Amino acid sequence: MQIKNAMVYTKDHKFEKADIQVEDEHIIKITPCESSMQEKAAGLSAADVHREDSPEIDAEGLYAIPGLVDIHLHGAVGHDFCTATVDELEKIAEYEAEHGIFAICPATMSYSEEILGNIMDKARIYKQRHDVANQMQSTEDDTMRADLVGIHMEGPFISRKKAGAQNPEYIQPADVEMFRRLQER
């Protein structure tokens, strides 16, 4: 796929007009539009630059930036991460992807180890389902979803003095063994 005329965020921390070539869901080449003109002047055809059977998107007036990572969210679209079903986690991830977020680290609240374990179990099931769908590249469901890349354990290991919305009943000092048990789920 070729994305033409996009305003691309560069390593110089500014936007420049460029063409982006994508193969197998990976960016393989970014060509400043001036270079595209130089290729044309050098006698290179569109076929030399990208495959003809590849779709082309004109991104004139649009910006292309790296996918964003949401490192602290408690939910979205009416669903709370801690109480969501696996299907509701998918809805949260769909919403995030629709808004430019390609990866999420949802945050926990302060709960008992049992409840936190159930949260971890649902997150694991979502992650496995998401990974299998990506590997199969299923055409049945081509819905974009943010990848769950971790869990932000905001609670229960948080300061009682700065508890905010956390339930003080479950706030406790850091417990490495409890964390490991939750991590292994």
Give residue ranges: language-model regions.
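Charged helix-capping and loop-helix junction motifs
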Residues: 85-88, 119-122, 175-177
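Intrinsically disordered, low-complexity terminal tails and inter-domain linkers enriched
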Residues: 32-57, 128-145
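Glycine- and other small-residue-rich loops at beta-strand/loop junctions that grip anionic moieties
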Residues: 81-82, 108, 168-171
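Divalent metal-dependent hydrolysis catalytic cores, especially in the metallo-beta-lactamase
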Residues: 74, 90-122, 146-159, 185
